[in-house]
């Protein structure tokens, strides 16, 4: 199994990938470095595939990886509905990609970062 070390220890790398994957699920677009984006693409594709499976074991596996953050807040009069990133993954993203076999993300290259010249990209979910 090959992966990028990203200049971090294993626990730091896992935390970084969890954070970036959750942000991509919530916002559907992130700006990051090229190496990070290529790693996050892999984990995001795995999470969306788990969302498409939709069984209890898939939900528990996704819940163990995706952070528990607020994805959306909607108000209906006095009712306030708060959905988490995990709920968005299973309720919104999984049905959207139900007929797609893979390739849920797209990477666009942008200008290098100003401070150190690191190659930057926009990682987004395909419509």
From Swiss-Prot:
Gene Ontology cellular-component annotations: cytosolic large ribosomal subunit
UniProt GO MF annotations: structural constituent of ribosome
Superkingdom, taxonomy of origin: Bacteria
GO biological process: translation
Protein keywords: Ribonucleoprotein, Ribosomal protein
InterPro entries according to UniProt: Ribosomal_bL17, Ribosomal_bL17_CS, Ribosomal_bL17_sf
Gene3D superfamilies noted in UniProt: Ribosomal protein L17
Binding partners and assembly: Part of the 50S ribosomal subunit. Contacts protein L32.
Family, per entry: Belongs to the bacterial ribosomal protein bL17 family.
Protein name: Large ribosomal subunit protein bL17
Source organism (scientific name): Pediococcus pentosaceus (strain ATCC 25745 / CCUG 21536 / LMG 10740 / 183-1w)
The encoding gene: rplQ
């Amino acid at each position: 199994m090959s992966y990028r070390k990203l200049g971090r220890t294993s626990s730091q790398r896992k935390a970084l990938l969890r954070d970036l994957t959750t942000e991509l699920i919530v916002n559907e677009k992130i700006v990051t470095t090229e190496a990070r984006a290529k790693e996050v693409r892999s984990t995001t594709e795995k999470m969306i595939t788990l969302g498409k499976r939709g069984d209890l074991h898939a939900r528990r596996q996704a819940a163990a990886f995706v952070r528990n953050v607020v994805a959306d807040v909607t108000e209906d009069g006095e009712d306030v509905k708060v959905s988490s990133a995990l709920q968005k993954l299973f309720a919104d993203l999984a049905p959207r990609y139900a007929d797609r076999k893979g390739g849920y993300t797209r990477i666009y290259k942008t200008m290098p970062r100003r401070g150190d010249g690191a190659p930057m990209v926009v990682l987004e979910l395909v419509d």
